[in-house]
Curated annotation (Swiss-Prot):
<feature type="disulfide bond">
    <location>
        <begin position="673"/>
        <end position="706"/>
    </location>
</feature>
<keyword id="KW-0325">Glycoprotein</keyword>
<feature type="binding site">
    <location>
        <position position="507"/>
    </location>
    <ligand>
        <name>Mg(2+)</name>
    </ligand>
</feature>
<feature type="binding site">
    <location>
        <position position="533"/>
    </location>
    <ligand>
        <name>Mg(2+)</name>
    </ligand>
</feature>
<dbReference type="Pfam" id="PF17789">
    <property type="entry name" value="MG4"/>
</dbReference>
<dbReference type="InterPro" id="IPR047565">
    <property type="entry name" value="Alpha-macroglob_thiol-ester_cl"/>
</dbReference>
<dbReference type="InterPro" id="IPR001599">
    <property type="entry name" value="Macroglobln_a2"/>
</dbReference>
<dbReference type="InterPro" id="IPR008993">
    <property type="entry name" value="TIMP-like_OB-fold"/>
</dbReference>
<dbReference type="InterPro" id="IPR050473">
    <property type="entry name" value="A2M/Complement_sys"/>
</dbReference>
<protein>
    <recommendedName>
        <fullName>Ophiophagus venom factor</fullName>
    </recommendedName>
</protein>
<feature type="signal peptide">
    <location>
        <begin position="1"/>
        <end position="22"/>
    </location>
</feature>
<dbReference type="GO" id="GO:0006954">
    <property type="term" value="P:inflammatory response"/>
</dbReference>
<feature type="region of interest" description="Factor B binding site">
    <location>
        <begin position="731"/>
        <end position="742"/>
    </location>
</feature>
<feature type="disulfide bond" description="Interchain (between gamma and beta chains)">
    <location>
        <begin position="852"/>
        <end position="1491"/>
    </location>
</feature>
<keyword id="KW-0882">Thioester bond</keyword>
<comment type="subunit">
    <text>Heterotrimer of alpha, beta and gamma chains; disulfide-linked. May be active with factor B in the presence of factor D.</text>
</comment>
<dbReference type="InterPro" id="IPR035815">
    <property type="entry name" value="NTR_complement_C3"/>
</dbReference>
Length: 1641
């Protein structure tokens, strides 16, 4: 749709008599020609009426040795001596070197005609659009996708498309060549990376990429969605109204949610969220609606001066919890701008040039502060008055009548809203420049199109206005354009015509017109025209009948009807709308398609131009004439610096607090008072709290007064609350459970079908097709999305069709994404009653041996209760998963007296192993030429030694092989968009300023080198340069007269700091101007003259104050490290100072001589790497043996417990190898550096940051872009009969090859051929948690929790709470500054936001700030930032953590404290609640667990036991065995006892075939010990059920439950006593009867 197909070229011909020798010949082509695309060119003869044949050629450039295209056309008077042939350049005929621009020569030859134009070539021959079945997936699931391919005229492209899948790290894991409209699944790996993946598609011979995105997360679908709607688009600072946010919560099947919302407002300032604690409110959600209000007084209490908030944004954080508490959805409305004016004005699609004396059409775009279009807003232009009102898309068109005698025009437009004072209206100004006529002729053409909303089918009025020499204009007889003529009468300066808008003009086109004067002047104008975004064709999806459009039952049959263009291929998909609650960013739409197409427009302005040639250039055209009138040669497919295009796209207590605070008139003191009356989570006294106040003595006094005042009041009130769940065992009137068929099919998307509309079209040319489908069993709303494709009308995305599915009574079983084996968890089933009457319900949990629950094999767990009409009720089921894997959990429910109403749900629950997941990575360099024997490199990868593995859990090993080099991995692994934190304003003393200046310098250097500014925003570069110059100017304050530096000018000068200033300033000169070379060279002179010793070493006499800024230089071998560091600074400044510092070369030689003497004797890997870089940079080292010998694994230079130093040292080593041209050694090093995901910082990380990014940037520059690659790799895995064979060559170098195995065994890899590759072996397993293995460095840490009772006010819907107390002390000599606490919450718990806010907001603040990472699929994490941690006393924090769902047998949570300035200083401790009552009983032997019954053996409750009763019980059908046993010993384990018994006699044999072979274990709960009262060396009669047998590896164990019969069998001597004679006889008879005769039938 772009290129010449977008242009209507109208020629206004002035007829002058004359022969061809005075004729003017014109050639117009697109400014950029696309390969494999039909492009239209125009050739015209003016002043020549002689018919002729023209030959059109397209040649290669510059040699013109190859004809890429040729065509012959006839030019004659019948065609007005104007021809518009099409040309097409085959992609395979032109060079594919994407590193340089490619051009072609368009040539026209004929009698008296020879025209040539060199035109830029583009490989973008079409568009590829990718549709996925949804935008978010879970690991291991299939991604369904379709590929649509079309050219620029929206016609089908018959070209092969290459489709790649890329991980979030940018690694290509799949690459396929596919054909037209292809659809297939890609299966995500279970070990795949979480995050945003890409599908990248491109034509086989084109570098242009088209990308679709999808997210991979561990998630479960919500049951409802929440929408927030602010009362205004912005917060008007001068208003008096409060700010309201409407909350709407709807279940996905359309019904309203009943529940509660917790709302917190805040202000986002410079990216940091500042919450307003007093705004936290609890809002009832009734009938799905609620409203939250931010009062201006509440905002002012947090920010007294509201004017300081202008330019920042409000946000509202809302969490909605259902009435049953079963589900929770959190959302946020952000971007509510705080403004003085509620509007912003932009000049969009407005020409930069005007014609004096002619109308000038000005298009303005008015937005709300959030960027959305502002409709019905009056606007007015000043100076030249014109008024208008914005349309629904926010645009307004103003027509200005320009004066004749001006060359520039200052245009100011403002809003003219009646409710706003003038000073609050939005204003915007621009300057337009006069169009320059050719040779000052005064001839003008203005094309006027006044319509603003244009759609297909309209007749567009077009006016041609001409002004100039009257004699010339009178000779214009007609206007000619491509589809006909428009007559013009003599003296007529305005000619009008109508242009029919056809679908092929969507989404926009350019109308270019020109006329010629004589044989050398062209007068031209153009206008850009936007057309409403609709399909070129037709596609509608709907229900086939009225019945089909109604609400459906789950699994019901229905019909949908498709209507569209005959022959169209229609791709369908149905998506659960819950998916869009989580992510709706990547859904395909018609607007996104047109946006993509419009971005390929080679035009650069909204129309017009600086002069006649500028009109063509700005419209994306190239022109040449026979009189050498030529547009400029275009050298870029993109426009120069284009402007952003915006598409339309408690009362008494409160009274007491308030009255006390009101006693303070000063606002600051009032805040001190108010903060003191907030609850302190740690329980600190008022006096201790006051120690944390930094605002002065007056604030402390006010704080203490109010704190003591409120203390007595706070002690008076206590609240308690409880919960009672009734239970009813009545079973009458319910249908049989076996008659309830459970719902089991709950896909997130389905209906992935492609159909063709083959029916005969109706009178409107529309074909239809009716499809019968069976709905899936989810209670939700399905959104059916249809995308059609036709060869002539391209792609069309229909409006989604919604299908609602629900029942009057149903179960919503809320199952988490995964649970941990042995970890007790609560599963909730929510029962909904949408019937018009109350119902009595029975609900039951079905038994599954994979879980321990209240349901057993003998008896299911049931509850019965009443659910009121139009309400719901949650039923909790507590389970303990016992087996890893996917297991069914099923709940069924029926309604008493209503046989047709029931429901059942069966879902899969994923049970994962306990422990913590660990990864072990091994990297092997495959280089058969260097490492092979006889051309083959063989590697044996040994099995992992995993002593800490959780028993009976799987080990997964993933082998990834990728060809080197890995430059593309750098650019993706080190994401430029994550470097924003480095662009900061320098400040502080001479040392601190350099720390902060380093950040923007290295960020700019890296982003410049890797060309990644686009990821951060190109405007950020100007900001970074500004910060660099700010740092430079501030550092001049600390420059001494001798050009040396210190933290303060009154301190002694530092060798290291001066060298560092030289290094950073020298680096900055590559990016910014204005840094004095004399400043740099002055520092160099000082270093040489004052700090270099005779032996060449540099000496440090005045160490810096901030030792951490020096990185790894401190420590052993410091003289060598200081010398090497200083030498590096001298070398990096050499190009600047070589001419002005005479002694520079000799100084460098002395330093290198010194280092060479020390190099081979160095002990520290860090020192070795730094010295190697210094020597290599000076061209004094080319042998890497010493350097590589100091490495660990040949990919890193490590020292114990010093991660940031290791990053720094490894970066030095990489630089050294690059200087030595040892490129083959660099791949694994680069991979290790990028795998660290280290994005740097300032304090404590300065040197690691600067060296990492300097090294990676240098790698990008120096690494050869390609090398010969032809590798054969064979992997022999233990479980595979046939080896895996991979071939790596230049065609597939970027594709990562992967293999997986679950066997932890040795395997072999062999490689042969040319080139290198990197093999990464990643082993993932679950390791046992071992707190004692945690090493604490520089911190002492204690963590504890205790149960607390919640009053009603604090409950917030929680089921319980713990108080988490964290105490820490820094073990250094001074306080630790800027410390971070990373807390992993217990499963089911969330932090109390009020407690955390109080800790961070008051004047006695204990924490600087906090963040909560609440990923529903994982445990919640809390990050707390502390300004300091004392080294002399314990610092304690305490806050509540609230239990939102029941969890037992939980794994410990963790607390990690570490220094922001030095990540190696850290300590981790674990915590967990007391395992008390309320937990289900389980018994584990080794790693195998069984559910234990809730009651003990009930034998003691039998009133009378005799022989017949024993025979009856022992012969019950479910009794498996009867034994006489002897108790050998009792072993106590965690929570249970093991009774080890010998089976003396098998009275009734059972499943255990040989129980007398070895002693058998009988296992019982600890609480049954007293009831059982079993004694060692006593004999027992015992029998039990088959379900109580527990098969182990080579024997059976037996569970003692309430169904186990145990009686003491007296010894032989006791049987002589009268007391035991009858009992002994009964036992003997029982044994004889069952042994000889067996059980009676």
């Amino acid at each position: 749709m772009e290129g010449m197909a977008l242009y209507l070229v109208a020629a206004l011909l002035i007829g002058f008599p004359g022969s061809s020798h005075g004729a003017l010949y014109t050639l117009i082509t697109p400014g950029v020609l696309r390969t494999d695309t039909e492009e239209q060119i125009l050739v015209e003869a003016h002043g020549d009426n002689t018919p002729k044949q023209l030959d059109i050629f397209v040649h290669d450039f510059p040699r013109k040795q190859k004809i890429l295209f040729q065509k012959r056309v006839d030019m004659n008077p019948a065609g007005d001596m104007l021809v518009t042939p099409t040309i097409k350049i085959p992609a395979e005929e032109v060079s594919k070197d994407s590193r340089q621009n490619q051009y072609v020569v368009v040539q026209v030859t004929g009698p008296q005609v020879r025209l040539e134009k060199v035109v830029l070539l583009s490989y973008q021959s079409g568009f590829v659009f990718i549709q996925t079945d949804k935008g978010i997936y879970t690991p291991g699931s299939p991604v369904l996708y379709r590929v649509f391919s079309m050219d620029h005229n929206m016609r089908q492209m018959d070209k092969t498309v290459v489709v790649e899948f890329q991980t979030p790290e940018g690694i290509v894991v799949s690459s396929n060549r596919i054909d037209l409209n292809f659809t297939r699944p890609y299966n995500l790996p279970e070990l795949g990376s979480l995050g945003t993946w890409k599908i990248v598609a491109k034509y086989e011979h084109s570098p242009e990429n088209y990308t679709a995105y999808f997210d991979v997360r561990k998630y479960v679908l919500p049951s409802f969605e929440v929408h927030l709607q602010p009362s205004e688009k912005s917060f008007y600072i001068d208003g008096n109204e409060n700010f309201h946010v409407s909350i709407t919560a709807r279940y996905l099947y359309g019904e309203e949610v009943e529940g509660v919302a917790f709302v917190l407002f805040g202000v986002k300032i410079d990216g940091a969220k500042k919450s307003i604690p007093d705004s936290l409110t609890r809002i009832p959600i009734l009938d799905g609606d609620g409203e939250a209000t931010l009062k201006r007084d509440t905002l002012r209490s947090r920010f007294p001066n509201l004017n300081e908030l202008v330019g920042h944004t409000l946000y509202a954080s809302v969490t909605v919890i259902t009435e049953s508490g079963s589900d929770m959805v959190a959302t946020e409305q952000s971007g509510i701008h705080i403004v003085t004016s509620p509007y912003q004005i932009y000049f969009t699609k407005t020409p930069k040039y005007f014609k004096p004396g002619m109308p000038y059409e000005l298009t303005v775009y008015v937005t709300n502060p959030d960027g959305s279009p502002a409709a019905k807003v009056p606007v007015v232009s000043e100076a030249i008055h014109s008024e208008g009102t914005t349309l629904s898309d926010g645009t307004a068109k103003l027509i200005l009548n320009t004066p004749l005698d001006t060359q520039s025009l200052l245009i100011t437009v403002r809003t003219n809203h009646g409710d706003l004072p003038r000073e609050r209206q939005a204003t915007k100004s621009m300057t337009a420049t006069a169009y320059q006529t050719q040779g000052g002729s005064g001839n003008y053409l203005h094309v006027a199109i006044t319509s603003t909303e244009i759609k297909p089918g309209d007749n567009l009025p077009v006016n041609f206005n001409v002004r100039g020499n009257a004699n010339s204009l009178n000779q214009v007889k007609y206007f000619t354009y491509l589809v006909g003529r428009q007559p013009k009468g003599a003296g007529q300066n305005l000619v009008a015509m109508n242009l029919r808008i056809t679908p092929d003009l969507i989404p926009s086109f350019r109308f270019v017109a020109y006329y010629q004067v004589g044989n050398n002047e062209i007068v031209a104008d153009s206008v850009w025209v936007d057309v409403k975004d609709t399909c070129m064709g037709t596609l509608v999806v709907k229900g086939a009948s009225l019945t089909d459009n109604q609400i459906h039952m789950p699994g019901a049959a229905m019909k949908i009807k498709l209507e569209g263009d005959p022959g169209a291929q229609v791709g369908l998909v149905a998506v659960d709308k819950a998916v869009y609650v989580l992510n709706d960013k990547y859904k395909i739409s018609q607007a996104k398609i047109w946006d993509t197409i419009e971005k390929s427009d080679f035009g650069c302005t909204a129309g017009g131009g600086q002069n006649n040639l500028g009109v063509f250039e700005d419209a994306g055209l190239a022109l040449t004439t026979s009189t050498n009138l030529n547009t400029k040669q275009r050298s870029d497919t993109k426009c120069p610096q284009p402007a952003n295009r915006r598409r339309r796209s408690s009362v008494l207590l409160l009274d007491s607090k308030a009255s006390k605070a009101a006693q303070f008139q000063d606002q600051d003191l009032r805040k001190c008072c108010e903060d003191s009356m907030h609850e302190n989570p740690m329980g600190y006294t008022c006096e201790k709290r006051a120690k944390y106040i930094q605002e002065g003595d007056a604030c402390k006094a006010a704080f203490l007064e109010c704190c003591r005042y409120i203390k007595g009041i706070l002690d008076e009130n206590q609240w308690e609350s409880g919960l009672f769940l009734p239970r009813n065992d009545n079973e009458d009137g319910f249908i049989q459970d076996s008659d309830i068929i459970p719902r089991t099919d709950f896909p997130k998307s389905w209906l992935w079908h492609t159909v063709q509309l083959t029916e005969q079209p109706n009178s409107n040319g529309i074909s239809s097709k009716t499809m019968s489908i069976y709905l899936k069993e989810s209670i939700t709303t399905w959104e059916v999305l249809a995308v059609s494709f036709t060869p002539t009308k391209g792609i069309c995305v229909a409006e989604p069709y919604e299908i609602k599915v629900m029942k009057d009574f149903f179960i919503d079983l809320r199952v988490p994404y995964s649970v941990v084996r042995k970890e007790q968890v609560e599963i909730r089933a929510v029962l909904y009653n949408y019937a018009g009457r109350d119902i009595y319900v029975r609900v039951e949990l079905l038994y599954n041996p994979a879980f321990c629950s209240a349901s057993t094999e003998e008896q299911r767990y049931r509850q019965q209760f009443t659910i009121k009409a139009l309400s719901s009720r949650a039923v909790p089921f507590v389970i303990v998963p016992l087996q890893q894997g996917l297991h069914d959990i099923e709940v069924r429910a029926s309604v008493q007296g209503w046989e047709s109403v029931s429901d059942g749900v069966k879902k899969k629950l994923k049970v994962v192993p306990e422990g913590v997941q660990k990864c072990i990575v091994t990297i092997i360099k495959l280089d058969p030429r260097a490492k092979g024997v006889d051309g083959t490199q063989r590697e044996v990868v040994k099995a992992r030694k995993l002593d800490d593995k959780v028993p009976d859990t799987e080990i997964e090993t993933k082998i990834t092989i990728q060809a080197d080099p890995v430059a593309q991995i750098i650019e993706n692994s080190i994401d430029g968009s994550k470097l924003n934190h480095l662009i900061i304003t320098p400040s502080g003393c001479g040392e601190q300023n350099m720390i902060r200046m380093t950040a923007p310098v290295i960020a700019t250097y890296y982003l410049d080198t890797t060309e990644q500014w686009e990821t951060l925003g190109r405007n950020h570069r100007n900001e970074a340069v500004k910060q660099i110059m700010t740092g430079y100017a501030q550092q001049m304050v600390y420059k001494k007269a001798n050009h040396s530096y210190a933290a303060f000018t009154n301190r002694a000068s530092s060798t290291w700091l001066t060298a560092y200033v030289v290094k950073v300033f020298a680096m900055a000169t590559k990016m910014v101007a204005g840094i004095s070379h004399e400043i740099i060279c002055g520092g160099v002179r000082w270093l040489i003259l004052n700090r270099q010793q005779p032996d060449g070493a540099f000496k440090e006499n005045a160490p810096v104050l901030s030792g951490t800024m020096q990185g790894g230089i401190q420590g052993d071998e410091s003289e060598v490290t200081v010398t090497a560091f200083t030498l590096v600074a001298l070398l990096e400044s050499k190009t600047i100072c070589n001419d002005s510092v005479n002694s520079l070369d000799s100084s460098i030689k002395k330093a290198t001589d010194y280092l060479l003497k020390k190099y081979e004797k160095l002990q520290r890997p860090y020192t070795t790497a730094l010295t190697a870089y210094a020597l290599a940079a000076a061209d004094r080292l080319n042998d890497d043996r010493v350097l590589m010998a100091a490495s660990t694994g040949k990919n890193r230079w490590e020292e114990y417990n010093a991660h940031t130093h290791n990053v720094e040292g490894t970066s030095y080593a990489l630089l050294a190898l690059l200087k030595m041209k040892k490129f083959d050694q660099t791949g694994p090093i680069v991979r290790w550096l990028t795998d660290q995901n280290f994005y740097g910082g300032t304090y404590g990380q300065t040197q690691a940051t600067v060296m990492l990014f300097q090294a990676l940037a240098e790698y990008k520059i120096q690494m050869p872009t390609h090398k010969d690659l032809n590798l054969d790799i064979i992997i022999k895995l233990p479980e595979r009969e046939l080896p895996l064979h991979y071939r790596l060559d230049a065609t597939n170098a970027i594709l990562a090859r992967t293999a997986e195995t679950k066997l932890n065994q040795d395997f072999t890899v062999s490689a042969s051929g040319d080139g290198t590759a990197t093999m990464t072996i990643l082993t993932v397993y679950n390791a046992q948690l071992q707190e004692k293995a945690n090493v604490c460095n520089k911190f002492h840490l204690d963590v504890s929790v205790e149960n607390i009772h919640l009053n009603f006010k604090h409950a917030k819907g929680a089921k319980g709470a713990l108080m988490l107390k964290i105490c820490m002390r820094y073990l250094g000599e001074v306080d630790s500054t800027m410390t971070i606490i990373d807390i992993s919450m217990l499963t089911g718990f969330l932090p109390d936001a009020e407690d955390l806010t109080r800790l961070s907001e008051g004047v006695d603040r204990y924490i600087s700030r906090y963040e909560v990472d609440n990923n529903m699929a994982q445990k919640v994490a809390v990050i707390i930032y502390l300004d300091k941690v004392s080294h002399s006393e314990d610092e304690c924090l305490q806050f509540k953590i609230l239990k939102h769902f029941e969890v037992g047998f939980i794994q410990p949570g963790s607390v990690k404290v570490y220094s922001y300035y030095n990540l190696d200083e850290q300590c981790t401790k674990f915590y967990h609640p007391d395992k008390g009552t309320g937990l289900l009983n389980k018994i584990c032997v080794g790693n195998i667990c069984r559910c234990a019954a809730e009651t003990c053996s009930l034998l003691s409750q039998q009133e009378k036991i005799d022989l017949p009763l024993r025979i009856q019980k022992a012969c019950a059908s479910n009794v498996d065995y009867v034994y006489k046993t002897k108790l050998l010993r009792i072993e106590e384990k965690d929570g249970y006892d093991i009774y080890v018994m010998d089976v003396l006699e098998v009275i009734k044999p059972g499943t255990d075939e040989n129980p007398q072979a070895n002693a058998r274990q009988y296992i019982s709960q600890r609480k049954c010990q007293e009831a059982l009262n079993l004694n060692v060396n006593d004999d027992y009669l015992i029998w039990g059920l088959r379900s109580d047998l527990w098969p182990m590896k080579d024997k059976f164990s037996y569970l003692i439950t309430k169904n186990t019969w145990i009686e003491r069998w007296p010894h032989e001597d006791e049987c002589q006593d009268e007391e035991f004679q009858n009992l002994c006889l009964d036992f003997a008879h029982l044994s004889n009867i069952l042994t000889i005769f067996g059980c009676p039938t």
